[in-house]
From Swiss-Prot:
SUPFAM superfamilies: Prokaryotic ribosomal protein L17 (SSF64263). Keywords: Ribonucleoprotein, Ribosomal protein. HAMAP family: Ribosomal_bL17 (MF_01368). The gene is rplQ. It comes from Mycoplasma genitalium (strain ATCC 33530 / DSM 19775 / NCTC 10195 / G37) (Mycoplasmoides genitalium). This is Large ribosomal subunit protein bL17.
Amino acid sequence: MSYINKEGKTTAWRVMTVRQQVSAVLSYGKIQTTLKKAKNTQKRLEKIITIAKVDNFNNRRAVKKWLLNTNSLDVDQLTNHLFKKVAPRFLKRNGGYSRVLKLGVRRGDSTEMAILQLIDATN
């Protein structure tokens, strides 16, 4: 993950950014962010959804440590949403639960932007 390890950014900042973005994707279905942050967040999101496919106490605890409160859901509601609505959509799918769509560059600083979204797998 050398592409996300920038000068002046601490490990705590990087971990918190991933936690915020994972929570937002699970809450809203998609987010718009920079390409590098989207790719970094996608890795953790895939692992969290894979863990959530089996609903037990230990898996809920493992997932909860990566989630944060969002504007619409708190951590407990977000965990229930993940285990009851999001993960069952992907039971027959082995990975590839999300995708990164490139949007082009941001006007202000020419940073590549992207959308990170969950794939709508209903079967």
